[in-house]
Amino acid sequence: MGHMVEGVLHKQGIEIASATEDVCSIDPALAKQCVVIDFTTPDAFKANYRFLADNFKAVVVGTTGWDEIKTEVISYFYQVGTPMIYSANFSIGVNAVFAAVAKVSEILKGYGYVPHIEETHHVHKLDAPSGTAKVLASIVKSGLGIAPDITSVRQGEVPGTHVVKFKSEVDKIKISHEAFSREGFAEGAVVAATMTEDLKGVHEFKELLLNK
């Protein structure tokens, strides 16, 4: 993802201060002037989030797989006063799907619909279910009152496909998103980075998009 983000930044004429796999090697004086976009691994983010909060102007996190320390991370960013935007998926299209699924779930509540989520990704993806599928499941449960089962598939080089199904005795509704490449995730992360100007606190990307 790092190379994708670099490509989007170059395309938009945004200066890249540093692109590194060792964030702790960055000069703290430089870091304080920069927004960092983190697409690493769950273990790397867990090890580095305090350094990111302590040293950077703002932080955008696209890494998933740190749900078990989410409360701790958010609390620390508030404690040190560094703005942070995080998301399981920065694709603008996926975030539109989040909003659509939320609305449909609310409408269908009490009418006998059973939800199910299917997600397919490339074989290199470390987490299953995907962070996006977990967000979708949370949205469905909140609106419909039923927690959906999730089916995860890992095959080939699939960038990411998510399908949310609502099935009743009389019909079936499908809401889906298929990524053609990973560039959409990078574009959304750059959008998030531009949102950090004058931002305070910790925010999930989908909420900022809905309330813009």
Question: What do these predicted regions represent?
Answer:
Residues 32, 79-82, 146:
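A short helix-to-beta-strand connector/capping loop
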Residues 29-47, 57-61:
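Rossmann-like NAD(P)-binding element
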Residues 16, 59-60, 84:
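Hydrophobic beta-strand scaffold residues
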Residues 10, 53, 78, 109:
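Anion (oxyanion) recognition and catalysis
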Residues 43-46, 50, 63-106:
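Rossmann-fold NAD(P)-binding glycine/threonine-rich loop
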